[in-house]
Every structure is written in C-alpha cells, then in structure tokens.
Amino acid sequence: MANLKDIKLKIKSVSNTEKTTKAMKLVSNVKLKKAKDFAKQSKAYAIKINELLSEISAKIQVNIKSFADDKFFDTNREVKIVDIIFVTADKGLCGGFNIHTIKKVKETIEEYKSKKIKVRLRAIGKKGIEYFNFQGVELLKKYIGLSSSPSSKKAAEVIYEAINDFENGKTDKIVLIHNGYKNMISQEMKVNVLLPVEPPTANENSYVGSNMEFEPSDGGDNIIRTLTKKYFEYSMYYSLIDSLAAEHSARMNAMENATNNAKERLSQLNLEYNKARQSSITTELIEIISGAESMK
C-alpha cells in the first residue's frame, strides 16, 4: 500500500486538476452563451439571403446566359478540382470536436478522389492545420486565430480568395465543412456546397413556381452580385460563429466530465488515505503494545 505522503501528493494534484477543469467549464459556459446569441442573430439573416438567392437562381436556370455571373449557378459545370474549406478549433480540451471534423474532411477527400477529382484544402484552425501538416498533406491556405475570434471582415477575405479561384477556373466547386452547434450536449457536422449555388426544386408554394418573374435588366447583374456577395460572406461568417459555439459546448462537456472524474478519483484517494492511515495507526499501536509486553 502506498505511504501517506505519496497519497497526500496525489490528492493535492487531483484536487488542483478539479479546480482547473471546473473553472474552464464555467468560462466555456459564459462564452457559449455569447456565441449562441451571436449565432442566433446572424442565422436568420443568412437564411433569408440564402432563400432569396436560391429562388432567383432557380429562375435563372431558364435563361442563364443572360447574366454575367452565370457561372455561380451553373450546376452542370464539369468538376475536376474541388476546394474544401474546413473549420477546426485553435485549442484542444474539447472532446472529439476536432477529431470529428477532421474525420469528415478525410471522408470527403476520399469521396472526391474516388471520382478522380483533385482536392485542395483551405484550413481554418490550428488543430486541423497541425493534424494535416503532421500527415504530410498539402494545405493551400492556413488560417490561425480566425476560428477562436471570428471576424466578418476576415471571413470575407477567406471566402473571396476561394471565389476568385472559382471565377478564374482554378477550382470548379467550393465545399464548406464545420462542426456546428446542435444543443448543449451534442454537435452537428455540416457539409455545404457554396459554389455552384444549388437552386431548390420549384413548387406551387415557391415564388419561382408561382408568380415570381425575374427579368434581366441593366441592374440585374448588380442585384445578383450583391446577393451572392452577402450569401457567401454570411455563409462563411456564420460557419465560424456556429463552429465556435459548438467548440465551447464540447469543451464545457469535456471539462464537466473531467471534473466528475477528478471528484471520483478524489473519493478513491481519500478512501485509500484513510485505510493507509488506519493501517499505520494499527501498526503503531501493535508496536507500542509489543514493546510494553517485552518490558514486563
């Protein structure tokens, strides 16, 4: 049985760990609430832009050559190269958050490679960058600091770098992958095709399938550019905020589990300490009694 001094050192170490994980859980909880509120505010706007753009893009399919930006909506474009933008955290200690994202990225890479399609990676987040660097996988772009501190300006820069390559024929498709917030105890992996824009199927309840008429004019191209610009910006920015909320949720749960494990370990160590102390006292009493008996 371990001696009392060793057990006391273990108790102190585990106790300090418990305090640290408990504090990290509280910090993550506060950050999660802020990220959730921010994401909620941005999501409604992003969804409305997406819906409007998709409705118009469906109408454009009928007369796609009328628009200067028709390549954004050309879903029949031959795909030879795909750019994958993926978001991981800059920090660890968040359970399987980063692992799940990396796994989905690898699966997506293999899916395209099986179709003889070249894949280029644009990595956001230190953990994803470190992993693929270690694996010897080439990364076209690397962004550190953006996933932990989302910026709409920086998000726009990231997405427009990819869009420029799309317009210049360097890539034929842009896919965005991130681990999003679902609820307090789970996350949801999201894989979205940003380009080309996928229009919905027209039906009697949609603007496209009913009375919506979209006639090209001198300002038509500007309308499309403005909508697509906002759509891409907010899709990128929202994915960063959504990922951050999911990260804080995962870290909060990981720290809660770590705290519970530390408490359980402390209970075991205290029991072990009490047993060792009792054994030590018993041994001392036996020695005293034996000594007294020998003196008779």
UniProtKB/Swiss-Prot annotation:
Q: How does it assemble?
A: F-type ATPases have 2 components, CF(1) - the catalytic core - and CF(0) - the membrane proton channel. CF(1) has five subunits: alpha(3), beta(3), gamma(1), delta(1), epsilon(1). CF(0) has three main subunits: a, b and c.
Say where the protein is mainly found: membrane
* Function as written in the Swiss-Prot or TrEMBL entry: Produces ATP from ADP in the presence of a proton gradient across the membrane. The gamma chain is believed to be important in regulating ATPase activity and the flow of protons through the CF(0) complex.
Q: Which GO molecular function annotations are given, in alphabetical order?
A: ATP binding; proton-transporting ATP synthase activity, rotational mechanism
Give the UniProt keywords, A-Z.
ATP synthesis, Cell inner membrane, Cell membrane, CF(1), Hydrogen ion transport, Ion transport, Membrane, Transport
Q: Which residues form the signal peptide?
A: none
What is the annotated localization of this protein?
A: Cell inner membrane
GO-annotated cellular components: plasma membrane; proton-transporting ATP synthase complex
Disulfide-bonded cysteine pairs: these are: none
Q: Which family does it belong to?
A: Belongs to the ATPase gamma chain family.
Q: Report any one BP term from Gene Ontology.
A: proton motive force-driven plasma membrane ATP synthesis
Checking HAMAP family in the record gives: ATP_synth_gamma_bact
Any idea what this protein is called? ATP synthase gamma chain
Q: Which PROSITE patterns does UniProt cross-reference here?
A: ATPASE_GAMMA
Q: How does it sit in the membrane?
A: Peripheral membrane protein
NCBIfam families named in the record: ATPsyn_F1gamma (TIGR01146)
